[in-house]
Amino acid sequence: MKTLQAKLSNKKNNFVPYIMAGDHERGLEGLNETIQLLEQAGSSAIEIGVPFSDPVADGPVIEQAGLRALAKNVSLSKILDSLKSIETEVPLVIMTYFNPVYQFGIENFVAALENTAVKGLIIPDLPKEHEAYIKPFITDKDICLVPLVSLTTPISRQKELVVDAEGFIYAVAINGVTGKENAYSNQLDHHLETLSKLTDIPVLTGFGISTLTDVERFNKVSAGVIVGSKIVRDLHENKESDVIKFIKNAINF
């Protein structure tokens, strides 16, 4: 079992914050500081976004964070260089669209992840049918390709998505972009329970989660939550103490 899956399988109430690499007043020089803060608060893993000019799955908060990072000339190459010097016991998960990876070179990208704390990849615009672009390069590495499973995904398709999944299953709690609040289907709890029965891999819920009420709800029917827009917004507004408090409360339900 790879590191990411082992870490998330060992407990319930997993909390995975999302941050945008380079969205800091000191740009990428502040990345390590943010990771250490999130680790010390009790994060199970940390999702690190790569800024992209056409972020189709991102809501306005994360899109603006990406634009701020791009304005600081943050790139995938520079992020990978920064990660080499970051030491953390918490597994890092890179969230990137496929184009930056393709432009960088897939084999070069995976090679650059060696000797870093990166243990997972999320590529939202890479469908299951095209995973062969990536998987041959990570099969023998301690890196997982994390699938996203939408609320509207038919059961037959869910089975295909989770059959050989590693790390965790990213259950998309809403239809649409990240950051939407209070748009949850009343069928969501059933959806998550059904999905969890299809796999032994931890199922984590993300998209739109912004309150402790949301966290408590989804911790009951999945292995934990991924919180993006709230974390990104609070960090941008220098509310680090709020972030720490939120995470500590979230993992102690």
Swiss-Prot record:
Does the keyword section mention Amino-acid biosynthesis?
yes
Superkingdom of origin: Bacteria
Q: In which pathway does it act?
A: Amino-acid biosynthesis; L-tryptophan biosynthesis; L-tryptophan from chorismate: step 5/5
A single Gene Ontology MF term assigned here is:
tryptophan synthase activity
The EC number on file is 4.2.1.20
- Give a Gene Ontology cellular component term annotated to this protein: cytosol
User: What reaction does this catalyse?
Assistant: (1S,2R)-1-C-(indol-3-yl)glycerol 3-phosphate + L-serine = D-glyceraldehyde 3-phosphate + L-tryptophan + H2O
* Active-site residues (renumbered): E47 (proton acceptor), D58 (proton acceptor)
| Complex and partners | Tetramer of two alpha and two beta chains.
Q: Which family does the record claim for this protein?
A: Belongs to the TrpA family.
NCBIfam families referenced in this protein's UniProt entry, alphabetically? trpA
Do you know which PANTHER family this protein is assigned to? TRYPTOPHAN SYNTHASE ALPHA CHAIN, CHLOROPLASTIC (PTHR43406:SF1), TRYPTOPHAN SYNTHASE, ALPHA CHAIN (PTHR43406)
The record's function comment reads: The alpha subunit is responsible for the aldol cleavage of indoleglycerol phosphate to indole and glyceraldehyde 3-phosphate.
Q: What is this protein called?
A: Tryptophan synthase alpha chain
Question: What organism does the UniProt record list as the source?
Answer: Lactococcus lactis subsp. cremoris (strain SK11)
The gene designation is trpA
